[in-house]
Amino acid sequence: MTNILVTGGCGFIASNFLNIMKEKYPHYKFINLDYIDYCSNELNVKPGTATLVKGDIRDKDLLTYLIKQYDFDIVFHFAAKSHVDNSFEDPKDFTLNNAYGTHVILETFRENKPNVEFIHFSTDEVYGESTTGIPFSEDTGVLRPTNPYAASKAAAEMIVQSYIYSYKMNIKTIRCNNVYGPNQFPEKLIPKFKKLLKEGKKCTIHGTKSAQIKRAFMHVEDVVNAVDIVWKKGESGEIYNIASDDEISVIEVTKLMIKTITGSENYDKYITFIEDRPFNDSRYYICSQKLKKLGWKQNKTRHDLINFLKD
């Protein structure tokens, strides 16, 4: 039997990963390690999908016990603090969770199961702001994160790289665009605005440059498919971008949501501008040709986003 550890499995992306992967690989055993943060929910994971262990990724004794108990074949490390706004308020918490937490997991496996397969889930934000028309590739030499969340994830990646080179651990890293779909906590743009509009409230947009700020949104099913492909076909030590081909400005996606959910084109009625972040990257433009060569493609389109908004 293949034993799999999934960290943060009650969160948004990881819960969808568990639900989809268990259906695809019913004979695999999944252990879900999650301390159930405010944005996580046990009910996100379908009954019978995984064994839930409530605990912290920084608890080395617990990790050691789990490794000895289950002798894991692979780790999918999703657990992370991810809300950028919160990272401005408490940057240290993000460093402790995302960078130090990753270090504890890696070190515990190095000591107890160094040959484990390890998939590290990161973010496009480690690249920093895109200021040219050339997309970032995995070979981009310098990471320039501009907010505490992105910096904590970049720091985690540096630790990952050191374990690849120093200890020859089998690790693959994934950097992903913005994701939407079921189980997402309503603090990120799409679920937040969807909730506000259904309640008859206004969407709150940071700053006044929303026409210049662009994001690429992907459905979580496409992301889970990419993670599965990286696991099965990716090379150890490599990094893979998961990028959407459908980039849209914040103001455009907000107007799309308003029209889809309310039926109105009186956009001013449903939009209010609030104070901008200390720094707000205008764009994360990344390339996923490396992943596409493994056979991945984006199946969900903007039409699927519209259908998701209608639900």
Name what the model sees in each region.
Residues 105, 160, 193, 291-292:
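Structural element of the ATP-grasp superfamily
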Residues 13, 62, 94, 152, ...:
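Hydrophobic alpha-helical packing elements
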Residues 41, 84, 132, 138, ...:
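Glycine-rich, flexible loop/turn motifs
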Residues 10, 130-135, 158-231, 254-260:
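NAD(P)-dependent short-chain dehydrogenase/reductase
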